[in-house]
Amino acid sequence: MELRTRGWWLLCAAAALVVCARGDPASKSRSCSEVRQIYGAKGFSLSDVPQAEISGEHLRICPQGYTCCTSEMEENLANHSRMELESALHDSSRALQATLATQLHGIDDHFQRLLNDSERTLQEAFPGAFGDLYTQNTRAFRDLYAELRLYYRGANLHLEETLAEFWARLLERLFKQLHPQLLPDDYLDCLGKQAEALRPFGDAPRELRLRATRAFVAARSFVQGLGVASDVVRKVAQVPLAPECSRAIMKLVYCAHCRGVPGARPCPDYCRNVLKGCLANQADLDAEWRNLLDSMVLITDKFWGPSGAESVIGGVHVWLAEAINALQDNKDTLTAKVIQACGNPKVNPHGSGPEEKRRRGKLALQEKPSTGTLEKLVSEAKAQLRDIQDFWISLPGTLCSEKMAMSPASDDRCWNGISKGRYLPEVMGDGLANQINNPEVEVDITKPDMTIRQQIMQLKIMTNRLRGAYGGNDVDFQDASDDGSGSGSGGGCPDDTCGRRVSKKSSSSRTPLTHALPGLSEQEGQKTSAATCPEPHSFFLLFLVTLVLAAARPRWR
């Protein structure tokens, strides 16, 4: 009876070993012809590629079963997979930058065209209407438009002060032309001091100041917002992949080839976990990115109506014409008030004597009706901004679907990182803090990428400027694309996650993947979800233990 029982134990152990060996496709030596073909198509030499599977103890990233990959092949494919992901990221970034650039150039060109058309209308209409009141002061008007362009382009000018200085200079020159025999040079100071009370140009200066401040601030903040968004995308695209990510990408994309199943495509959730871990820092841009785009959509409300950007920027000449008309209409009253305030001036010995008859008249200009161009441009821009709002958090899924040849479904035929089979771990959340338990990529959540943290700050700064511009505030526009210094005591962790969470494993400083591949970590084999058979050497150990137990059984009795 004891011999029969002992034979039963031996039979069970042997059967288990045979069944598992047959059930694991990697345990049989198979042809590597398909892998050779794929490997050669990528430009690698086939001299070291085995004809059939070999033992895989030398592998450092892929599972160490039977394999079609040598150490050199694994290294080449690891570097190649990293370059493929970097290329895919750059393609996505360039596409987003192109979208933003298209919107920026369209709207920026339109606003500048409005200002150019206004100046052109002034140059065509003012000489005939105002004669030398305009022709002798063309530089003052030209300088005004030049400063308005500088302000629109983001120059650190104070628009209200710029306009006030223009009106003061213009008053001196025009009043001197109207009364050349009354105004010696020392009389002009008093005139300037009385200008605000005298209101020589009527309501035109005040109306232009109120409307232009809001209109130009809204227009330039929107255009600058597009520029900042594009610059953030460009700088984030330059952030290198971490070594842990490079290992995970190799395992995702090419370890199936080494395993001898190149036709197995990555399981969807497996791919998402790898990319969410690789792009954890990028996902942290999401909140401030959305805030910026929302603020840009909101500021477009300031483009419409009588005080809107299109009406005001394209109608600067209208307010200038009204100002000169008011000065001519109120010439006599204004002269009397100036004499009352400043006294009777001495006759200017260099004056032109009695006023000569000059060709002067009134100019009635109407604002040009909207062509609908800006409405179309803004409508397209708002639609594009809404489409790209979730760019950073949707990037892993987009890359998996479009670049990683992801399997359409998670089933027994997709690649789970170890073999063909279902992928069981849950998909991680978005952002750095949610990667603490990522089963595919080791992420140190206490070490955020500083370049990306700086870009998050740039997004915040630009959003605050847009919100100020919505209220009509003249914000100080520095170059928001400049890199921040990164100084300060904060480590950059969002909220208080650094205090609440601890990394699974403290990693060394991140450097680009070199040709020397790191060794397989002790946890690598534990990060599997498939219910696969253990390697054959495990069953040999089980088999020996079973023999010992069976042999010792009579003695226990």
UniProtKB/Swiss-Prot annotation:
Q: Which residues form the propeptide?
A: 530-557
In this record, residues modified by a lipid of the kind GPI-anchor amidated serine are 529
Membrane topology for this entry? Lipid-anchor; GPI-anchor
Q: Name the segments for region: Disordered.
A: 477-531
* Taxonomy, superkingdom: Eukaryota
User: Cellular component GO terms, alphabetically?
Assistant: cytosol; endosome; extracellular matrix; extracellular region; Golgi lumen; membrane raft; nucleoplasm; plasma membrane
Q: What UniProt keywords apply to this chain's record, in alphabetical order?
A: Cell membrane, Copper, Disulfide bond, Endosome, Glycoprotein, GPI-anchor, Heparan sulfate, Lipoprotein, Membrane, Proteoglycan, S-nitrosylation, Secreted, Signal, Zinc
Q: Which InterPro entries match?
A: Glypican, Glypican_CS
The GO terms describing molecular function are: copper ion binding; fibroblast growth factor binding; laminin binding
Listed under GO biological process in this entry are:
heparan sulfate proteoglycan catabolic process; myelin assembly; negative regulation of fibroblast growth factor receptor signaling pathway; positive regulation of skeletal muscle cell differentiation; Schwann cell differentiation
Q: What is its main location?
A: membrane
Q: Which residues form a coiled coil?
A: none
Q: Where in the cell does this protein reside?
A: Cell membrane; Endosome
Mutant lacking the gene: phenotype: Null mice with induced pancreatic ductal adenocarcinomas (PDACs) exhibit attenuated pancreatic tumor growth and invasiveness, decreased cancer cell proliferation and mitogen-activated protein kinase activation. Pancreatic cancer cells isolated from the tumors of GPC1 (-/-) mice were not as invasive in response to fibroblast growth factor-2 (FGF-2) as cancer cells isolated from wild-type mice.
Q: Where is the signal peptide?
A: 1-23
**How would you describe the post-translational modification of this protein?**
S-nitrosylated in a Cu(2+)-dependent manner. Nitric acid (NO) is released from the nitrosylated cysteines by ascorbate or by some other reducing agent, in a Cu(2+) or Zn(2+) dependent manner. This free nitric oxide is then capable of cleaving the heparan sulfate side chains. N- and O-glycosylated. N-glycosylation is mainly of the complex type containing sialic acid. O-glycosylated with heparan sulfate. The heparan sulfate chains can be cleaved either by the action of heparanase or, degraded by a deaminative process that uses nitric oxide (NO) released from the S-nitrosylated cysteines. This process is triggered by ascorbate, or by some other reducing agent, in a Cu(2+)- or Zn(2+) dependent manner. Cu(2+) ions are provided by ceruloproteins such as APP, PRNP or CP which associate with GCP1 in intracellular compartments or lipid rafts.
- State which residues carry a glycan (glycosylated): 79, 116, 485, 487, 489
List all disulphide bridges recorded for this chain.
32-68, 62-255, 69-258, 190-342, 245-278, 267-414, 271-400
Function according to Swiss-Prot or TrEMBL: Cell surface proteoglycan that bears heparan sulfate. Binds, via the heparan sulfate side chains, alpha-4 (V) collagen and participates in Schwann cell myelination. May act as a catalyst in increasing the rate of conversion of prion protein PRPN(C) to PRNP(Sc) via associating (via the heparan sulfate side chains) with both forms of PRPN, targeting them to lipid rafts and facilitating their interaction. Required for proper skeletal muscle differentiation by sequestering FGF2 in lipid rafts preventing its binding to receptors (FGFRs) and inhibiting the FGF-mediated signaling.
**Family per UniProt?**
Belongs to the glypican family.
Q: What is this protein called?
A: Glypican-1
